[in-house]
Amino acid sequence: MQNKELIQHAAYAAIERILNEYFREENLYQVPPQNHQWSIQLSELETLTGEFRYWSAMGHHMYHPEVWLIDGKSKKITTYKEAIARILQHMAQSADNQTAVQQHMAQIMSDIDNSIHRTARYLQSNTIDYVEDRYIVSEQSLYLGHPFHPTPKSASGFSEADLEKYAPECHTSFQLHYLAVHQDVLLTRYVEGKEDQVEKVLYQLADIDISEIPKDFILLPTHPYQINVLRQHPQYMQYSEQGLIKDLGVSGDSVYPTSSVRTVFSKALNIYLKLPIHVKITNFIRTNDLEQIERTIDAAQVIASVKDEVETPHFKLMFEEGYRALLPNPLGQTVEPEMDLLTNSAMIVREGIPNYHADKDIHVLASLFETMPDSPMSKLSQVIEQSGLAPEAWLECYLNRTLLPILKLFSNTGISLEAHVQNTLIELKDGIPDVCFVRDLEGICLSRTIATEKQLVPNVVAASSPVVYAHDEAWHRLKYYVVVNHLGHLVSTIGKATRNEVVLWQLVAHRLMTWKKEYANNAVFVDCVEDLYQTPTIAAKANLMSKLNDCGANPIYTHIPNPICHNKEVSYCESNNS
């Protein structure tokens, strides 16, 4: 496809996301329309309209490409960007804080345009043969991004040249930039017993002998993009002039940027580094502040304490082992530290995939589930076909490998995993789910009630730790990340190809009832299962409203029909057109 066609395809994906967010957040089309039509009344005279290609019980709808604008008696096809702009203006006009939203509108449209153009560039990579092991390919082939985000691929700060060098969708790898930092100006923390291991692996990654580093200096890896940000920081410059930072330059093994962009993977050493980059990706500048790195290691300490007890051959937790960050002021000074330098230098080391090797069939779920707006097929469709199982049997196996251990972990320990589709990996054997891996502990939390009962609080982490939440909030977060984001995406992806999504939700409900009987002596587990089975609605992030209100850090939630509960009541219909 030519560049113009790629941009058109990217814009098609963008309007699909905007429509799905709008309908979810406005509680529209919660049952399939009999005439397969959708419409948005913009004003007394103007209406946007089009046709569903596929209706999804979880809201992952697909659409025919034509979007019509009806203005009085005239009807014409409008562009995707024009349709998006009109939907956003319509939402802004009905917002409580209309003036603030209108002032923010230009930036929102700029971010959407940025996301569309970035997506078009990444789709170009999708047409090129890419020779790597399947796991690396999976991490680097999430071309469209979050299905319920208005700007899933926006990246403000990266130039076009930076994209080519550092964006995972461009199928790249690169060496890191290393600093030797005096211990007096470096903040460090490690999971108990992991400091020596972190030290060893970082020297291996840098291909630097410890004898080359002066006494009392510690190795600090940085992203090659970020080193230029640090060099402009006054405190960094002062440290360099004082000889407290020695620039070692680019060195060592190449690493692969993963789907999160800032986290990189060393295939040679099977280790992840979560590195700060001062780039706004979707809603946030992707740096690591003090609370984030502290809660990450608190969470890792909890996981380390229960890992042997809760892991099975088919369920693994990948935890962070430690962090290193530049201090804004030398130790001993009483000046309140200015956290910007720490935030822009704090890096976290995460353990790799257990028993990893390049021949294994491991995928990050997000790219496995991704469908293009003009096709119901996905990599997941290919996997299920390869397995030889019926989709229902494949899903049942998947639930046993993922949802069941996640619910058991929560009910037995209070650990609420942020197991969304970019944090979860699945290892397949002949296309059949075999091992589930959950990573990135920054977002996990603990139910104060359960964790206190199990003595994780205060024996492992203090009750005041940012990782400790009220029980209801911990359960709320698990339901969103695991059921709405993860399971909802999975079931709808299978449903797009098989046209039986509601039947699949019936299977999920049946599995929950089976587990309820099997684990009837676990009161918390039974309560969780009954909540999923009986509660008519479930909370989902309202990313479009949050974007309009500029509150991504504290997102708005909306309540949507719970397809597990409604699976027997919701009728299913689809367009005969494909």
From Swiss-Prot:
GO biological process, one term: siderophore biosynthetic process
Transmembrane segments annotated in the record for this chain: none
Claim: Glycoprotein is one of the keywords in the record: no
Gene: sbnE
Gene induction: Up-regulated under iron-deficient growth conditions. Repressed by Fur under iron-rich growth conditions.
Result of knocking out the encoding gene: Mutant shows a growth defect in iron-deficient medium and is significantly attenuated in a murine kidney abscess model of infection.
Keywords from the UniProt entry: ATP-binding, Ligase, Nucleotide-binding
Catalytic reaction equation(s): (S)-2,3-diaminopropanoate + citrate + ATP = 2-[(L-alanin-3-ylcarbamoyl)methyl]-2-hydroxybutanedioate + AMP + diphosphate
Family the entry assigns: Belongs to the IucA/IucC family.
EC annotation from Swiss-Prot or TrEMBL: 6.3.2.54
InterPro entries attached to this UniProt entry: Aerobactin_biosyn_IucA/IucC_N, IucA/IucC-like_C, LucA/IucC-like
Highest taxon of source: Bacteria
Protein name: L-2,3-diaminopropanoate--citrate ligase
UniProt pathway annotation: Siderophore biosynthesis
Assembly and oligomerization: Forms a mixture of monomer and dimer in solution.
MF GO annotations: acid-amino acid ligase activity; ATP binding
